[in-house]
Every structure is written in structure tokens, then in C-alpha cells.
UniProtKB/Swiss-Prot annotation:
Family from the record: Belongs to the type I cytokine receptor family. Type 1 subfamily.
Lineage of origin: Eukaryota, Metazoa, Chordata, Craniata, Vertebrata
Extent of the signal sequence: 1-23
Keyword Transferase in record: no
Record-given protein name: Prolactin receptor
Residues spanned by motif Box 1 motif: 471-479
GO molecular function: cytokine binding; metal ion binding; peptide hormone binding; prolactin receptor activity
Gene: PRLR
Glycan attachment positions: 59, 91, 100, 112, 132, 262, 303, 315, 335
Transmembrane segments: 439-459
Motif (WSXWS motif): 419-423
Alphabetical UniProt keywords: Disulfide bond, Glycoprotein, Membrane, Metal-binding, Receptor, Repeat, Signal, Transmembrane, Transmembrane helix, Zinc
Organism: Gallus gallus (Chicken)
Extracellular face of the membrane: 24-438
Cellular component, GO, one term: plasma membrane
Biased composition (Polar residues): 787-796
Length: 831
């Protein structure tokens, strides 16, 4: 909390200074102490380099303290040593004492101090350069030598006991290496072994012990004469035309050989043999020749030489070839002006204007010039160069307010030639953009902003958690009733689905599914139709138990023992080729299905014993598989039976081939059987008595008398096999179930009736069948032959069709002329 408050206060204090900096005004830059120097160990001076002034007038003050004192003193003299300096006279100079010196720059906004400089007068002694250096050649015993003389520095007191040590250096004028000679405390020196006829350069310097060497004195030149000799060869330095109309050439003389020497410039033009002399030796100065318009020719090459002549002889320079077109170098531009423009609602900018050189004829187009300018801040060292082109005016927008700039311009011809010299330096001060009112506005805005920041930071410290919760509310959890968020976080999807009431898929059946295309109903002599005493409605006393059918709709009929046993017999009649196609797969399932069939036979026998006491009806025993649903009357509702039939038409039936009839009858598996109840048969008899029609019920045969086509022990159960639609009229096929080891078909005797037509569908899922008097009775001896023939023919047709589709005409042959199909002729058996 305390640190936040301190940082906020600092922001408030520094914000006005930052605002002023944005306005172009700031506290001054830090100055830098360049050097401190003592000329004679009695006085010394210090110089500094100012920093930026921050756009405001700045004062510089030098403060110093001595190592043995705590008091701070100010510079005693700011004038003697020049600007930006401080002079310490004898009264303020203490030898063997260390001075701690700093320079402080101050303006209206603030101040800034330099780094401290520690000074000991003994170690900063550097005397001035010797003065009055003179050179003279003398001859002694026909030997020529050089005599040099000088004086001590001007500030040296003659009455002082300081001794200066001197040093002299000399070199030939044309060479770069110096020869240094230590002189000692004397102020004169004799130099021998000099080459006659050579020009020499001489300098001298001094020092105090201890201390540093002074600067070298100014150069002095002298020619060592060599008696009587011709002059040396002169050198042509350059030729230049300022306006492409006239030109001038300059040369450098050689040694004169000890005699007065005259210099003559001679030239000739290309294509001419005549030699001309320089027309003007005065206009361009000494050692030069000026060619006016009369003597200047364009697109002509000049061959120029300079000849030096004295009493002993002459010497000529190397030839110099000149084409006026390529030696054009104009004079610098003139009348350079700088003007600061201050438009309304815009930033100020600088306008530079200049004029071409006076000698250049740019109006007539004889000479076209291109311009280039350079500028830099007064304190800067690097120049910024801008190419302007042929215009004589330029606007500059990106100048820093409060700075002082130096600007120069030069020019050159547009095609051939070289750049002129830079014009003289021009200075301009860029004022600050912001006025006092603007500064006040920015200061007020800065203070208000700092207060707002302080309030926000204080609020964040006090109510940080509440504000974070308000700005970033937590993500709400799921609000679905019954969902456990812990289950979602742990990723237990199964437990989550069970909590929502979503159950998994039902388990698959252990046996192969068999889907039947048609239903067949067979009736015998002892099967009696139960009369109904109700108008399409079941008895109110009847207790109906519903059974949720399988999603496959028809498995109860498909997997019935009577159907499967007959399928086994029909499949055995197929050719041997068909019987061996899937034998390998079927044999692998034999062991498992035999054990399952044994359980079914035991349950069936138990059901036969329980149903033997009833004389009116029989029901189906149900083989309860795991996860099976409670039983219900599946065939009391023709609507439900019809739905089951429609669902089975879209399912593929797997065909299984077997080896022989005995194995197929024993290994056919059952999936589901639909049980009936004894109480329903009584209610169906009442329904039959009212409507005078028959229903699909079968009466149990109590006696051991064998029917012409079935065993008495196998007549306990009747099931609806399939509901089909033929010619837009519903029909029902019923199938009896056999448990005998062998399936045989017999026709019904003349005394029995066969119900083959559906009269109507009553309410409450009642199916009404009508007897058909047109059905002929086929002798029992002919049925096996037809069945075998039909099985062979059907096997060839359904070899590659998986036993899913069968022609209705073939079914009529199996049922003795009725209009219902017997699926036992085309459905495969199961292993």
C-alpha cells in the first residue's frame, strides 16, 4: 500500500516535467569538463563543453572544493581564459592540492551537473608554445649550416626560476617524416648536414619538469642554397572554369637554385603547331594564368606547360591536357537566406532560398546547375545532406524546436564538372512550438491525469478483488438437473450417462438372427376356433400381460422350434454342393448350440406338463435369454404382428448350410418363444361365438391319437409365423411346432377345415380368419415328393440371395393350393 502511494506521488511530480518536455522545453543537458591546464605551476584554467540548453537560457557555474576542506567555492574568474572556462590565479592556486571541480547548468525548469573532475596543479602543467622562431643560413669554412632561434612562452615570468626544456623538429618540405632534436634549456640551435638547394620546415616546443610538452610552434620554411644551379621543375596543380566561358590554371614553383627565377606558362591547341603564352598572369593571382573568353575554345584540348628560368638555366613542368568542358567547377551559391514560416493551425517550417553564382549564365541556359544542401545542429558533428535539384528554394519541416542549425549549399553542372566549394555557414534558431498558454494546458491535463491514476490505483488496492470479480466474472457451472459436475471434471462419461438415464445398447443375441418374409398358419382337426361373445373387445376380466418385443420385430417367430425344425428338414434336401459352403463355420458352433438346445428341450417338456390340464387352449413356452423383457400376447394384436412383419423385411437373413437332416434338427437354435396364458383362450371363445368367425387358436389334443400329418405330442403349441400383404389384403400364416426328430407334412383330411383367408381385423388386436372351401386336399403320399422337388428348385434360385426373397407361387404348392407361403421351403436352418 505504501509503495503504491509513493509511486503515485512520483508520477504526479514528474508528469509536469514530462509535459514540458513534450512542449520542446526541458532542463539543460549535462555539461562536460574538457581539460584543466597550468602554464607555469602557479595558475591554471579549466574548460568545459556545454550540453543542450533545453530551449531556455542557461547559466553555467563552476564549483570546486579542496581535499582538505569541506567548503565549496565558485570559480573566481570566468573571462580571462575565454568562454566556457574558469581561470584560477595565484591566490586561488595551491600546489600539491587536489581540487574537486564540477560544472552546473541551470535554466528556468531545472539544473544538471557534470561529472566531478579531480585536479592536481602539479600534474596538469603544460606551458605555452615558444614564440619568435627564426631561421638563418650561415657559412663557416665553406660549410653551410642552419641557425635557429626562439623565445620562451609569453606567459613565462622572467623573474621566475622555472626552466623550460625545448625540442626542435625539422624535415624536407616534400617529405612527411620529421627529424626531432633535443635542445635542452637553450633557446637557439645549430643544425648541420643539410642538403644544399632543398627547402626545409622547422618547429619547436617546450616543457616544464614535471609536466607535459607544449604544442608545437608555427612552421617556419627556409631554402638551403646550393651555389649556382638551374631552378627545379615546377608542377601544375589544377585548371578550373567557373562558368564554362573562361578558365584558370595554377602551378607550384620548385627551388630557384639560389638565383631569381621567372615562370612562364606556354600552351598549344589540338590540331595546331603554334605555341602561345599565357594571356594574363595577374587576374587569378600569383603562380597562375587566366584565359579570358577570347582565348577559350570549347571542345578543344589544350596542351599546357610551365617553364622556370634563372641565370643558370631553365626547367619545364610535365604537360597538362585540358578540355574546358570537363574542368567546370562553379563558384558557391550566394545570397543564402533562411526564413521560418508559421502558418495557422500547422507546424512551423523553414524556407531556404539562394541565388546561383554571379559568373554562371543560367538564364540563357548556357550552364545548368544542380544544388545540394547540408545541415546539422550546432552541437552536432554529422551533417545531413539533401539533394535539391535545379530549384533555388527548399522547405524543411522536420526540424526540432529549440535547436540552432547550421546550413550550407553548393552546386555543380548537370552533366560534366565537379561540385563547387560549400557556401559560408548560415545559422538559424528554431523556436519552440508551444506557447505559455499551451504549456499551462498541458500541465493541467497532466495533473488531472495523475490524480485519476492515483484514484484508480488506490481503488485497485482497496477493492482489487471485487473489481476483478466484476470485470471478469467466474464462468458459471452447468445447470442441467441431474448432472454431477465432479463427473464432468473427472471425465467419467459412463457414470454421467447413467445419471441422466441414458442406457447403453442392448446386448446382441448369441445366435444368428433369422428374419422371415411371410407367416403361415396351419390348422388340424382337433384345433377348434374359440367363439367370442364380445363385439371386438376382450373381456374386462381378462388380464393382459404386455411383453416388450425385441427391436428386431419377429425374432419370436423366426426362432420358434417348429419353424427351425422344418427348416432343418428343408435344407437337407439341397444339393451336396450347397451343403458344404459354410460347413467349416457351422461346425465351430455345434458344441455351444447343443448345450443350449438341451436347456430348451427341458423347458419345453416342463411347459407341456403344465398345459396338459387345459382342454381349450395352449400357449408357447418362452426361453428367457439374458436381458429379456417380460412376456406378452404377441399374436392377440394383428397390428403388433403386422408391425413385426414390416420390421423384418428390412433385415438380412444369414443362410447356414448343414450336412445332414439329423444334425440340423438337433442343432437348430432358438432365440425367443412367445408364451400364452390359459385365461385368454376362454375370452377368445366368447369372441368367436359373437362374430361367427374363427381365430388363430389351437386346441390341445389330449389323447395319444396321431393325426395324419402331426404327432399328438407336438400339437401343444401354435404360433403366428408371418403377416404379409398380398393384393392390398392382409393374410396370416400360422405354423405348428414339432419336436420330433423328423419333419413330415400331411394334408388335412376332409373333415378338417383350413382357415386361409382373413376376414377382418377387429379392435383390440383381434385377427379374424375365414375358411376357404376351394382348398383341395392333397394326398399325404404326394407331399414329400413335391416338397423335395420344391426344395431343390428353390435351393438353385436362392444360392446367392441369402434366402431373403421367395416367389409367392412356390409357396402355394407347398401348402396344398392355399394362398399362403410356407417359409420352410426357402429359409435356412441354424446351427
Amino acid at each position: 500500500m505504501k509503495q503504491d502511494l509513493i509511486s503515485s506521488v512520483q508520477i504526479i511530480l514528474f508528469l509536469p516535467l514530462t509535459t514540458v518536455g513534450l512542449a520542446g522545453q526541458s532542463f539543460p543537458g549535462k555539461p562536460k569538463i574538457i581539460r584543466c591546464r597550468s602554464l607555469e605551476k602557479e595558475t591554471f584554467s579549466c574548460w568545459w563543453k556545454p550540453g543542450s540548453d533545453g530551449g531556455l537560457p542557461t547559466n553555467y557555474t563552476l564549483f570546486y572544493s579542496k581535499d582538505s576542506e569541506e567548503e565549496i567555492y565558485e570559480c573566481p574568474d570566468y573571462r580571462t581564459s575565454g568562454p566556457n572556462s574558469c581561470y584560477f590565479n595565484k591566490n586561488h592556486t595551491s600546489p600539491w592540492t587536489t581540487f574537486n571541480i564540477t560544472v552546473t547548468a541551470t535554466n528556468e525548469i531545472g539544473s544538471n551537473s557534470s561529472d566531478p573532475q579531480y585536479v592536481d596543479v602539479t600534474s596538469i602543467v603544460q606551458p605555452g608554445s615558444p614564440v619568435n622562431l627564426t631561421l638563418e643560413t650561415k657559412r663557416s669554412a665553406n660549410i653551410m649550416y642552419l641557425w635557429a632561434k626562439w623565445s620562451p612562452p609569453l606567459l613565462a615570468d622572467a623573474s621566475s626560476n622555472h626552466l623550460y626544456h625545448y625540442e626542435l623538429r625539422i624535415k624536407p618540405e616534400e617529405k612527411e617524416e620529421w627529424e626531432t632534436i633535443s635542445v635542452g634549456v637553450q633557446t637557439q640551435c645549430k643544425i648541420n648536414r643539410l642538403n644544399a638547394g632543398m627547402r626545409y620546415v622547422v618547429q619547436v616546443r617546450c616543457t616544464l619538469d614535471p609536466g607535459e610538452w607544449s604544442e608545437w610552434s608555427s612552421e617556419r620554411h627556409i631554402l638551403i642554397p646550393s651555389g649556382q644551379s638551374p631552378p627545379e621543375k615546377p608542377t601544375i596543380i589544377k585548371c578550373r572554369s567557373p562558368e564554362k566561358e573562361t578558365f584558370t590554371c595554377w602551378w607550384k614553383p620548385g627551388l630557384d637554385g639560389g638565383h631569381p627565377t621567372n615562370y612562364t606558362l606556354l600552351y598549344s591547341k589540338e590540331g595546331e603547331e603554334q605555341v602561345y603564352e599565357c594571356p594574363d598572369y595577374r587576374t587569378a593571382g600569383p603562380n597562375s594564368c587566366y584565359f579570358d573568353k577570347k582565348h577559350t575554345s570549347f571542345w578543344t584540348i589544350y596542351n599546357i606547360t610551365v617553364r622556370a628560368t634563372n641565370e643558370m638555366g631553365s626547367n619545364s613542368s610535365d604537360p597538362h591536357y585540358v578540355d574546358v568542358t570537363y574542368i567546370v567547377q562553379p563558384d558557391p551559391p550566394v545570397n543564402v537566406t533562411l526564413e521560418l514560416k508559421k502558418p495557422i493551425n500547422r507546424k512551423p517550417y523553414l524556407v531556404l532560398t539562394w541565388s546561383p553564382p554571379p559568373l554562371a549564365d543560367v538564364r540563357s541556359g548556357w550552364l545548368t546547375l544542380e544544388y545540394e544542401l547540408r545541415l546539422k545542429p550546432e552541437e552536432g558533428e554529422e551533417w545531413e545532406t539533401i539533394f535539391v535539384g535545379q530549384q533555388t528554394q527548399y522547405k524543411m519541416f522536420s526540424l526540432n524546436p529549440g535547436k540552432k542549425y547550421i546550413i550550407q549549399i553548393h552546386c555543380k553542372p548537370d552533366h560534366h564538372g565537379s561540385w563547387s566549394e560549400w557556401s559560408s555557414e548560415n545559422y538559424i534558431q528554431i523556436p519552440n512550438d508551444f506557447r505559455v498558454k499551451d504549456m499551462i494546458v498541458w500541465i493541467v491535463l497532466g495533473v488531472l491525469s495523475s490524480l485519476i491514476c492515483l484514484i484508480m490505483s488506490w481503488t485497485m488496492v482497496l477493492k482489487g478483488y471485487r473489481m476483478i470479480t466484476f470485470m471478469l466474472p467466474p464462468v458459471p457451472g452447468p445447470k442441467i438437473k441431474g448432472i454431477d459436475t465432479h463427473l464432468l471434471e473427472t471425465g467419467k462419461s459412463e457414470e454421467l450417462l447413467s445419471a441422466l438415464g441414458c442406457h447403453g445398447l442392448p446386448p446382441t443375441s448369441d445366435c444368428e438372427e433369422l428374419l422371415i418374409e411371410y407367416l403361415e398358419v396351419e390348422d388340424s382337426e382337433d384345433q377348434q376356433l374359440m367363439p367370442s361373445h364380445d363385439n371386438g373387445h376382450p373381456s374386462k376380466n381378462a388380464k393382459i400381460t404386455r411383453k416388450e418385443t425385441d427391436s428386431d420385430s419377429g425374432r419370436g417367430s423366426c426362432d420358434s422350434p417348429s419353424l427351425l425344425s422344418e427348416k432343418c428338414r428343408e435344407t437337407c434336401a439341397l444339393p451336396p454342393v450347397l451343403q458344404t459352403q459354410e460347413v467349416r463355420d457351422v461346425q465351430e458352433k455345434k458344441a455351444a448350440k447343443r448345450s443350449w438346445e438341451t436347456q430348451y428341450v427341458a423347458s419345453e417338456r416342463k411347459a407341456l406338463l403344465s398345459n396338459s390340464e387345459s382342454a381349450k387352449s395352449s400357449t408357447w413356452p418362452a426361453v428367457q435369454l439374458p436381458n429379456s423383457q417380460p412376456p406378452m400376447f404377441a399374436y392377440h394384436s394383428i397390428v403388433d404382428a403386422h408391425k413385426i412383419t414390416l420390421n423384418t423385411t428390412n433385415t438380412n437373413v444369414a443362410a447356414v448350410l448343414v450336412e445332414d437332416e439329423e444334425e440340423h434338427q438337433s442343432q437348430c437354435s432358438l432365440t425367443e418363444t412367445i408364451p400364452g396364458e390359459m385365461e385368454k383362450q376362454g375370452e377368445m371363445e366368447n369372441l368367436h361365438s359373437k362374430t361367427e368367425q374363427t381365430t388363430a387358436q389351437v386346441k390341445q389334443n389330449r389323447s395319444n391319437e396321431r393325426l395324419p400329418f402331426l404327432d399328438a405330442a407336438l400339437m401343444d403349441y401354435v404360433e403366428v409365423h408371418k403377416v404379409i400383404r398380398q393384393d392390398e389384403e392382409p393374410a396370416v400364416l400360422l405354423k405348428h411346432k414339432e419336436n420330433s426328430g423328423k419333419i413330415e407334412k400331411y394334408t388335412i383330411s376332409g373333415a378338417s377345415k383350413e382357415y386361409t383367408k382373413v376376414s377382418t381385423v377387429m379392435d383390440h388386436n383381434i385377427l379374424v380368419l375365414m375358411p376357404d372351401s376351394r382348398v383341395p386336399h392333397t394326398p399325404a403320399s404326394q407331399e414329400p415328393a413335391k416338397e423335395t422337388s420344391q426344395s431343390l428348385q428353390q435351393g438353385q434360385v436362392e444360392k446367392n440371395m441369402s434366402y431373403c426373397l421367395t416367389a409367392p407361387s412356390d409357396c402355394k404348392r407347398e401348402t396344398g393350393g392355399s394362398e399362403y407361403m410356407d417359409p420352410s421351403s426357402f429359409m435356412p436352418s441354424f446351427k
